[in-house]
Regions:
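C-terminal, surface-exposed recognition/capping segments
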Residues: 8-9, 14-207
Length: 207
């Protein structure tokens, strides 16, 4: 289990949903830290160099080479797994009202903030500023892990809890992500589920 200190605070951006975004990535102790890296639907996090190979990872959702992820048994109507499904890394590790954001909630963040590339304590990243109340939240550039290699460029990657659905929910192997690159946030981006990305938890007062 990840220590609760990993996400002990949140930022109120005044979002219409009432959702509150954690100040730190899951497993991080301050906003500029990367925290842990996760494959999608897997609750066990890893750090670069610990020997874990994401290419050989066993994703939480049952998988077969023929049928892919049998996701329909685990996902809600919007193709996101519920906080209590056992596959939400934020809810599993932090408990309480913490969970992973859905793709819709990432889009809500985009739609109600401005963003700029900046540096905080020597760490490059993206600062979002609420257009509603002026509060800010920082996402550090952390890269991602492919197999065992940490690849760091100028992009921010973060998992959502939402499967990328393209007609047959049982054969999908990608999930939606938060992605900043080329001086803008990228709507509707998705990635193969076995890459290692950080997670930024959200605090859901309704839970």
């Amino acid at each position: 289990m990840v220590s609760k200190v990993a996400a002990e605070g949140y930022v109120d951006l005044g979002l219409p949903s009432g959702l509150l975004w954690a100040t730190c990535n899951l497993g991080a102790r301050q906003p500029t830290d990367a925290g842990l890296y996760f494959s999608w639907a897997n609750v066990d996090g890893h750090v670069p160099g610990d020997g874990y190979n994401f290419g050989n990872t066993t994703i939480g959702l049952p998988y077969s080479g023929t049928n892919g992820y049998n996701a329909k048994n685990y996902l809600s109507a919007d193709n996101s797994f519920s906080p209590d499904s056992g596959y939400d890394a934020a809810r599993y590790n932090l408990g309480g009202s913490w969970r992973m954001p859905t793709n819709t909630e990432i889009l809500e963040l985009y739609d109600n903030t401005t963003w700029q590339y900046t540096s905080v304590n020597g760490v490059n990243g993206i600062l979002h500023t609420s257009t509603i109340n002026g509060n800010t939240i920082f996402f550090p550039i952390t890269g991602y892990i492919e197999n065992t290699s940490l690849i760091v460029g100028q992009l921010v990657y973060l998992w959502s809890s939402t499967l990328h659905y393209k007609g047959n929910i049982n054969t999908q192997n990608q999930a939606y992500i938060y992605l900043y690159g080329n001086n803008t946030v990228n709507r509707g981006e998705h990635s193969l589920v076995y890459y290692g990305f950080p997670i930024r938890p959200v605090y859901d007062p309704s839970l």
